[in-house]
Design a protein with these regions (language model features):
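Eukaryotic N-terminal, low-complexity and coiled-coil-prone scaffolding/targeting segments
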Residues: 1-161, 350, 357, 373-374, ...
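Eukaryotic terminal intrinsically disordered regions
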Residues: 1-48, 55, 66, 255-379
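Membrane-targeting and insertion segments and their boundary/processing signals
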Residues: 80-84, 104, 166, 173, ...
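Extended amphipathic alpha-helical scaffold segments
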Residues: 91-98, 111-152, 176-277, 289, ...
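Acidic, low-complexity intrinsically disordered regions
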Residues: 130, 167, 254, 363-364
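Hydrophobic, helix-prone linear segments
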Residues: 161-168, 180
Length: 379
């Protein structure tokens, strides 16, 4: 009979069991082809598995989408940072060739710290990266401007210059003009990445949802008892939804928190649209160059302020120069030129990938609320 074949196909009964019918103890389906204790247990497990599987399979699909969008967005922002770094090296080499070798490592450290700051748990990691950059840039700039023909500064004097930078303020208001909008954009990107990570972790946890034991009997009665009595009629839709909603109720409670997450992600997207992060990163090299120019123009004033805080300079008495760093390469110039041409495309990619991530989070809202319907539609 078709019903018996269905039971055999789903491994709810086997031929040996059928040969022993009729049996005793049909607690789940009340007799028929399923009346034995071992089949009752098999039915309970099958009912529990049926409910759990719809959660696992759909959760893993949503988890994959969230992590994919997260990785794509990070890749786009990281690419914008890399392009900005290449362009910064080009600008410094063209504008300050004497300073460029020493500035190269300082610039590299800045962009590396910004990349790390995008995913750092420390809320002030990005601000610290910018502050450290201005501290580190001052010693080579001051050496290049006032003492270019002398030996490198001693380590102690270099540290004094780093500490004095925030008092001397050699860059004028450029750090504020550069830092505030750039940090807003980077913090928005960081918040989006964090939100996607949180969403993916919540969904991953949900994929391991343990179906309550009492739901095994209800799911089995709904899905398999008809076959036990010789019919393959599908379960009543109303009964199916009632069982699924009751058994999956703990997951539905997440819907409210997920709505809050979706709202936060949407606001982050709006912030990214306002600040135009890729454009800010493209303009950053010019702003850094402008800061150095401000320091150059203030050379005599800087010297007075520095000597007040650090006295006369002391120099390294060895032939090793702490500013001797790898020279700027032709390949780097070419890469920077290509990066400049891609500014507009970079802005579009950041916003496009952010929008796709927001849509994925919105889709998650439907997932939490729609699990019972998904389960019943799959039967």
């Amino acid at each position: 009979a078709p019903a018996v074949k269905y039971l055999l196909k789903n491994q709810l009964v086997d031929q040996d069991h059928l040969a022993r019918l009729p049996g005793q103890g049909a607690q789940v389906c009340g007799g028929g082809a399923c009346c034995s204790p071992e089949i009752n247990e098999s039915l309970r497990k099958a009912g529990t598995t049926s409910l759990g599987e719809v959660v696992r399979s759909t959760a893993l699909s949503l988890h994959s989408a969230l992590t994919s969008h997260r990785d794509t967005f990070y890749g786009v922002v990281e690419s914008a940072l890399a392009n900005s770094e290449h362009r910064a090296l080009n600008v410094f080499q063209a504008t300050y060739p004497r300073l460029a070798p020493a500035a190269r490592q300082v610039l590299h450290d800045l962009y590396s710290a910004l990349r790390v700051g995008l995913t750092d748990t420390d809320d002030r990691a990005l601000e610290n990266a910018m502050g450290t950059f201005w501290d580190d840039l001052f010693p080579p700039v001051y050496h290049s401007v006032l003492h270019a023909r002398l030996a490198p500064f001693s380590r102690r004097y270099t540290e004094c210059l780093r500490d004095a930078q925030r008092v001397v303020q050699p860059w004028g208001i450029v750090p504020t003009l550069v830092g505030e909008p750039l940090l807003r954009g980077l913090h928005s990107a960081r918040l989006l990445l964090h939100s996607l990570d949180v969403g993916a972790q919540v969904v991953k946890t949900a994929s391991n949802f343990a179906v309550p034991s009492e739901c095994g009997d209800a799911a089995a009665r709904m899905q398999y008892c008809g076959a036990c009595h010789g019919t393959l009629a599908p379960p009543c839709p109303g009964m199916c939804l009632n069982v699924a909603r009751g058994c999956l109720a703990p997951l539905a409670e997440v819907d409210g928190a997920w709505a809050d997450l979706a709202g936060a992600v949407s606001r982050v997207q709006q912030s990214l649209q306002a600040v135009r992060l890729a454009q800010l990163l493209h303009q950053l090299p010019d702003k850094l160059s402008e800061a150095v120019m401000v320091a150059l123009e203030r050379g005599p004033q800087l010297q007075k302020k520095v000597r007040r805080d650090c006295s006369n300079p002391t120099h390294d008495d060895t032939s090793h120069s702490m500013y001797h760093l790898p020279v700027f390469t032709v390949e780097g110039v070419a890469a920077a030129a290509a990066a400049s041409a891609g500014e507009e495309r970079g802005s579009g990619r950041v916003l496009e990938s952010a929008g796709a991530a927001v849509r994925a989070v919105d889709a998650g809202r439907e997932w939490w609320a729609g699990l019972p319907d998904t389960h019943c539609n799959n039967l």
